[in-house]
């Protein structure tokens, strides 16, 4: 983080990833997300994140849609509120 601006270097999506917002928590390790391309997908929370990173409605996440089933995606990263605000001010998400 730079001292004068307060800007942090954040994880940005790779070629097959995109930003999404959690719309609904369906229980277990599944959430409904609204992706940056306008699609609603079923997001799967992987085991490495399940108990360490709590994902709630309204959270900004990074998802990777499945190649063989486009209506589903894996959640790869959850951004904190400060990180999500930085992404909004820089114009990466709406």
Swiss-Prot record:
Keywords of the record: Initiation factor, Protein biosynthesis
Any coiled-coil regions, as ranges: none
GO molecular-function terms, A-Z: RNA binding; translation initiation factor activity
Domain of life, source organism: Archaea
InterPro entries in alphabetical order: NA-bd_OB-fold, RNA-binding_domain_S1_IF1, TIF_eIF-1A, TIF_eIF-1A_CS
A Pfam cross-reference name: eIF-1a
CDD domains named in the record: S1_IF1A
KW ATP-binding (keyword) present: no
Residues in S1-like domain copies: 6-80
Similarity comment text for this entry: Belongs to the eIF-1A family.
Cited function: Seems to be required for maximal rate of protein biosynthesis. Enhances ribosome dissociation into subunits and stabilizes the binding of the initiator Met-tRNA(I) to 40 S ribosomal subunits.
HAMAP family for this protein: aIF_1A (MF_00216)
The protein, known as: Translation initiation factor 1A 2
Organism phylogeny: Archaea, Methanobacteriati, Methanobacteriota, Stenosarchaea group, Halobacteria
Encoding gene, per UniProt annotation: eif1a2
């Amino acid at each position: 983080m730079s001292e004068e601006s307060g800007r942090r270097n954040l994880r940005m999506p790779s070629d097959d990833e995109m930003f999404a917002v959690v719309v609904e928590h369906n229980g277990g390790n599944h959430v409904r997300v609204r992706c940056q391309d306008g699609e609603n997908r079923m997001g799967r929370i992987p085991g490495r994140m399940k108990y360490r990173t709590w994902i709630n409605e309204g959270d900004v996440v990074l998802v990777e849609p499945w190649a063989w089933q486009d209506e589903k995606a894996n959640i790869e990263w959850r951004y904190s509120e400060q990180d999500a605000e930085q992404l909004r001010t820089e114009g990466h998400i709406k």
